[in-house]
Amino acid sequence: MAVIIPEVFAVGVNKAMTSALRAGRIATDYTELVDDIRYCGNKVHFPVIDRISGASVLSDGGTVTFQRVSMTDNAATIKHVTNGVEILDRENVQVKAALKDAMAKQLGESLAQAVDSDIVSEILTNATYVDTVNSLDDAEVENAFVCFGDQRDAASMAGILINSRLAPHFMNMDGFVSATRTNTTNGNGVVVDGVLGYYSTIPVILSDNGTYKFTAGQNGGEDSSVADMIIVKKGAVGVVWQKEPTIEEARDIDKLGTKIAAQTLYAVKAVDLSGVSVLHVEL
């Protein structure tokens, strides 16, 4: 007898995974722009149109200069993430709807954590705008935006991803919590769905997946630790998803139980490094 209905269970896993994503929220979904991904190890191509050069002032009798539109092919490897649970027959009688929902939630969250870590790794490995500071305050956050020049409209930003160890630093910033500032948001500091608040209307998202590094001291030296703050513009980091997670159920007769596996395919690519700024904060 089936423990779950795979199609229904898949909806629950997908919902939980989408809700649990943190770094995934600052990545732009390119799924509808590419072909369906079907096989792990294959390549998926993120289409990016190259910027044309600046316009020129047309003189009397002059002609228009035409520039050919070109595209840069950003290929990424399709990856396979999976997790599973096993339910013994003697426990199955207790697996009511609420417990099945809990299983779907945990499976979805575990898939999300794996994808989040991969997105952060892609960013940290390829970022070109990187700085290291020994404290984090308003001035350092503003300096992290300098690399965007005059192209830093709040509406163009996907979000600010921070390790949870940096939350107290934001709570001490006037630019984040002061009621006298025009760029702050009421309720900042109250974490809702993983969002600490809004910095100049840009969501500040907490994520500990891949955003912290601890190094033990060598030969009696001091330990060191670094937490990351990552600013990403919309479209700078892309992700492609399989249409929905695949759920499979299999009977394990040796153990008198049932195994349930959840899996999905995805690909991640930093497609525009000019839209990414990374700040390593020494703690």
What is the meaning of each model-derived region?
Residues 76-93:
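Extended, low-charge hydrophobic alpha-helical regions
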Residues 45-48, 148-241:
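Extended oligomerization regions of viral-like shell subunits
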Residues 54-57, 95, 169-172, 269-271:
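Short helix/loop capping segments that flank catalytic or ligand/cofactor-binding pockets
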Residues 244-283:
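Extended, compositionally biased alpha-helical segments that mediate assembly or anchoring
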Residues 88-155, 164-166, 278-283:
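Alpha-helical scaffold segments that mediate packing/assembly in large oligomeric complexes
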Residues 3-5, 16-17, 21, 25, ...:
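Signature of extracytoplasmic/envelope-associated structural regions
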Residues 1-73, 276, 280-281:
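N-terminal "assembly arms/tails" that initiate or stabilize quaternary assembly
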